[in-house]
Amino acid sequence: MRAVQYRTIGSEPEVVEVPTPDPGPGQVRLRVSAAGLCHSDSFVMGLPEEQYVYGLPLTLGHEGAGVVDALGEGVTGVEVGEPMAVYGPWGCGLCHACAKGAENYCPRAAELGIAPPGLGAPGALAEYMIVDDVRHLVPLGDLDPVATVSLTDAGLTPYHAIVSSLDALPAGSTAVVIGAGGLGHVASRSCGRSPAPPSSRWT
């Protein structure tokens, strides 16, 4: 299969041929329909060698969506052919942080060798990717993977900020989004669906 990999510190990413991965026990293989690019991809490739911790070569892409293509042993709850988005923060799934839905704060991920897609594990800038657990798949139903893939990160970030602030935003209050770039636009639209109407300040 083809994949976009960062292969040498300081170099441009390359489109290369790599073996198509097989899902192991508990894993799901996704045929990628869409992958998003993020500032984090640029950040990772801009790190100097002494700060780079992700391993090489690295298949990029932590925003991914596609169709379930193959199931590893013991996988239940999903079917081959189902369209899914990939939830990017991966943790152990067992600790207090993971139980609260905060897998990005999992204290055991590093010691267990768990890394998010595109930020350690092979990511979505490939024809196929492995998702380590079905809990990291979000059913898309009739939604278009291309139209929704950026919600897995660029949408999730402002959504989390808004949901975390709802106690301070009673009905009739006003939310101000400062910096209405890509994530700011998502925040404004998300605020419009929350109890507080949006007000944007362009900076």
Please provide the spans of the model-predicted regions.
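Conserved hydrophobic helix-helix packing surfaces used for dimerization/oligomerization
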Residues: 3, 174-175, 199
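Short Gly/Pro-enriched turn/cap motifs at secondary-structure boundaries
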Residues: 19-20, 55-61, 116-121, 128
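Glycine-rich beta-strand-centered segment in the early N-terminal region that forms part
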Residues: 21-35, 49-99, 141-143
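Cytochrome P450 core scaffold surrounding the K-helix E-X-X-R motif
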Residues: 40-46
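NAD(P)H dinucleotide-binding glycine-rich loop of Rossmann-like/cofactor-binding domains
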Residues: 94-178
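N-terminal Rossmann-fold NAD(P) dinucleotide-binding loop
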Residues: 184-185
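Conserved S-adenosyl-L-methionine
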Residues: 193-198
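Conserved acidic E/D residue at the C-terminus of a beta-strand in Rossmann-like folds
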Residues: 203
